Every structure is written in structure tokens, then in C-alpha cells.
Amino acid sequence: MSEAIKNRYDFVILFDVENGNPNGDPDAGNMPRVDPETGCGLVTDVCLKRKIRNYVETSKEDAPGYRIYIKDQVPLQRSDAKALAYLGVQGDLKAAKKDDPTLDGKIRDFMCRNFYDIRTFGAVMTTFVKGALNCGQVRGPVQLGFARSVDPILPQEVTITRVAITTEADAEKKGTEMGRKYIVPYGLYRAEGYVSANLARKTTGFSEEDLALLWQAILNMFENDRSAARGKMAVRELIVFRHDSELGNAPAYKLFDAVQITRNEGVTVPRSYRDYTVTVAEPLPAGVTCLRMG
């Protein structure tokens, strides 16, 4: 494995949606998530991490060191079993730990070495937690917050029709079937994230190669994830703040506050990324540099 990163990073993701549903709320009939007090749209951190995982899985195709632990419809025990088989562990995990007190660390290192998303985001590995192993919970160096739209959004419920009929009985009664879908006409969303070099060194071994793949995955996370429900989505810009040290040279909030998004003059209802201007206030704190990608 490559050496762990030595620098802390904080970053801002700007992405937009046009005539789509960026993240449906199952508790609200799959309506786009909205902050009820402000009317601003929300996208969960879990949703964004899923996009990143999907991109890595697609681009790396299960290459050694880049497997994905959290997969759709795949039991986690299958991946857990690979670690136990590699280490020759059979039967009761508590008994195995008594025989080998270093078993916790060995399992954790195997999982971090082989699964990119554990190395990046961490994981709760239930099999090992139930076996009373300390390696069952791994805290990852990369963390994301919820994305929030820059301006309030107004979700619309669109009625659609289908010419196909489901059953023979329905065919005798009606000629079409009705359906509904939610869309956001336009919304620019902002998400903020963190990369801890300290956790990378102490826990998962997240490397410079992993970091480069993370930036690539963020920039392209919607490019291979198209669907009729999501409409037109794109990452417009990734703004990265690099610290000259492991623990950082400035509080993250000061760097995030430096990223300012304003509506252009005369724009009352934004319908395009071109309706906004994005700036990074300077000078930045000493020991911090900014890289803008996208």
C-alpha cells in the first residue's frame, strides 16, 4: 500500500439539477428533500457517498485494493468472510481473539487494504461488532455533510401517462394509466466535506492515489448515474483547500465562508448555473492553498 496522505483538506462541491429529483424522501412519497423552514433543497451525505462508491466500482471494476464494501443488494457478510478466510479464522470470533490478541488489527488492516470505501469513509462491520472485535467500527478520514441548495426550491409534481396497460382486466376498462413524478425545475446545491490526514495515518492508510481518485469520482459522480428520475445533474465545480500540515492551518468554517455564491444582477428566478457567480475571497489564511476543479 502507498503511504498515507500528510495534508488535511477541506472542500466544497457545487452541483446542480435541472428538471429532476436529486434525492427523494421516502417519508414524503419520494418528493425532493426540503428544509421546511427555509424551502431550500437537501441532499443527504449518504446519497453523495453512494454516487462516489458507484463511480469507483465502475471505473476500477473490482481491482485489488479498490473493491466496494457497501454494495446494493449484497450481504456484508460475504466481504467479512473474505477477511476471516484470509487470516484462517474459523468458528467463534471471541475464541479466535483469545488465541490471537492482534486479530482486531489484522482484520481492520485487511478490510482497509482491500475496500476503497472503508479506507475512505470508514464502516460499521456488523459481523465483527457482534464478535466483540474492536475492528468492527472504522472511522474514515473523508466525511461529507448534507448538500443544501443555494436558493429555495419549488418541487413540482408532474402527472404522466402510460399507454401500456398492466393486466387484461385493466385493458377492458381503460386505455391508459396515470402516474406522477416529482421534479425540481432548477437548483444549485452546495456540499462541504473534510479529509483528515491524521485519521488516514492512524487508521485506514488513505493515500495520495486514493485522494486523486476521490476528486475524480466527485467530479464525475453523476456522469454514469443517469436516470429519468434525476433529470440533468452535473458537478459544476470542486473547490479544494489544501493545508500545509496534517492537522490544518485554519478552521474549516473560515475556508467555507470564503466561498461565496451570488446571483447575477437581474436574476430573480435562477434557471442555470450561468445565473450565479462563484468567488473565493482572498487572501486565504497562511499555509492554505486553493485548487478549483471542474
Residue spans for each PLM region:
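RNA-binding basic/glycine-rich loop and surface signature characteristic of RAMP-family CRISPR effectors
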Residues: 1-294
